[in-house]
């Protein structure tokens, strides 16, 4: 735990291997969460989907008696909207010194949603300025009109801008936070951890 804290103070990442049953999930992760969730830094624990329930229960068990600390679950998929409610929850989690438990799929989906939002805004900008009129993306002008009808009075780009803003603000909290990866060999495996959208 001291080594992890020392590396964090120097702004470095660290990967530490421990044998099975040595207390990675039940001792080290809760201790790090206790020390790192200080109200200024979001502490997020990412575990494989199969271990999500168990890891969340371990955290809740550790932080429900003597030392009380909220434990929340971050769930996100590509069809969810990024709005002020999601941003407020993440911000409140940081302020409450909570531990946020998530699966790698949720974190990757959020990052891909950010990329998608940036791409949509770029397309909208090109369509609005008259650029990129050719090819498959050239029809964005009529897509924008259709989306405006679906949304109603709000313009498509206003909705996209709002979503992109909250996406960026949430990502800032993530980037200034700490990510605890449990079972890192599974989470970062190039063949087993891919997320196809």
What positions do the PLM features span?
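N-terminal pre-P-loop "Q-motif" helix
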Residues: 1-10
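Eukaryotic intrinsically disordered and solvent-exposed regulatory patches
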Residues: 2, 29-33, 83-89, 164-167
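Pre-Walker A (Motif I) flank of P-loop NTPase domains
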Residues: 9-16, 40-42, 96-98
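Walker A/P-loop
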Residues: 9-31
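Conserved helicase ATPase motor motifs in RecA-like P-loop NTPase domains
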Residues: 18-23, 46-49, 183-187
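Signature of the SF2 helicase/ATPase Hel1-core->accessory helical subdomain module
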Residues: 33-34, 108-197
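Conserved motor-coupling elements within RecA-like helicase/translocase cores
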Residues: 78-100, 113-124, 150
């Amino acid at each position: 735990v001291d080594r992890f804290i020392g590396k964090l103070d120097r702004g470095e990442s660290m990967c530490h291997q421990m044998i099975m049953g040595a207390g990675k999930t039940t001792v080290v992760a809760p201790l790090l969460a206790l020390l790192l969730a200080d109200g200024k830094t979001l502490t997020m624990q990412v575990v494989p989907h199969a271990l999500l329930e168990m890891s969340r229960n371990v955290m809740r068990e550790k932080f429900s008696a003597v030392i009380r600390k909220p434990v929340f679950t971050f769930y996100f998929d590509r069809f969810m909207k990024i709005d002020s409610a999601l941003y407020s929850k993440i911000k409140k989690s940081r302020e409450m010194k909570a531990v946020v438990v998530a699966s790698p799929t949720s974190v990757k989906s959020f990052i891909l949603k950010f990329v998608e939002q940036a791409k949509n805004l770029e397309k909208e900008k090109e369509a609005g300025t008259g650029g990129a009129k050719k090819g498959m993306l050239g029809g964005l002008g009529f897509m924008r009109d259709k989306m405006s009808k679906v949304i109603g009075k709000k313009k498509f780009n206003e909705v996209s801008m709002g979503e992109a803003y909250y996406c960026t603000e949430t990502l800032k909290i993530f980037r200034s936070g700490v990510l605890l990866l449990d079972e890192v060999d599974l989470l970062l495996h190039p063949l087993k951890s891919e997320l196809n959208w």
